[in-house]
From Swiss-Prot:
A molecular-function term among this protein's GO annotations: rRNA binding
Subunit relationships: Part of the 30S ribosomal subunit. Forms a tight complex with proteins S10 and S14.
A single Gene Ontology CC term: cytosolic small ribosomal subunit
Record protein name field: Small ribosomal subunit protein uS3
Keyword field contains RNA-binding: yes
Any one Gene Ontology BP term: translation
Organism: Thermomicrobium roseum (strain ATCC 27502 / DSM 5159 / P-2)
Region forming the signal peptide: none
Amino acid sequence: MGRKVNPIGFRLGIVHDWESKWFAEKDRQYREQLHEDLDIRELVHRELPRAGISRIEIQRAVNRVDVTIHTAKPGVVIGKQGANVERLRQLLESRIGKKVHLNIQEIRKPELDARLVAESIAEQITRRVSYRRAMKHAAAAAMRAGAKGVKIRVKGRLGGAEMKRMVWEIVGRVPLNTIRANIDYAVVHAPTIYGQIGVKVWIYHGDVLPEARPPIAAGVVAE
């Protein structure tokens, strides 16, 4: 039976870029660096659970790791006089044993970020807010912010029902088969007393041609 491919993985190298950018010469080195990446992401999300972090990009030099944190709340990540970001850098360096540079990149429109939208819906479902209301408000906010289309799916024992079911909220168009379409995608799970509720979000930002790809913006660097 056919399955839908991940929209971000389907467009890597065309519209989207990799979140880990490094090269390993040996299999053992690859395994070690892969586990370091997993540790870095797990530690950042654990230390900053409410910082509105969408994604974490990792690049490597010889004895240095550059970590870019994309967040909707840069003030929470940086902290008063940089206290939080300095503490996070020290924790990362003690965990992986290498020098770490932190780059904080602000997400100016969180309504257009699929990960943040999915987390917001999941949090509302956990707090027993109506899932239909949360979906409609999230889709409307994304369209007001400039999205070309939004698709939201929640699945599970909605409202405590005996059998699981699936509910969709679709606004505009989301062309999943168009490779040049810039589609953001995220999956989040909402824990409830009835079990896990799955939340999927697709946000269509329009088509992106190779010459029109946005440049990488610089952020705040902590060394």
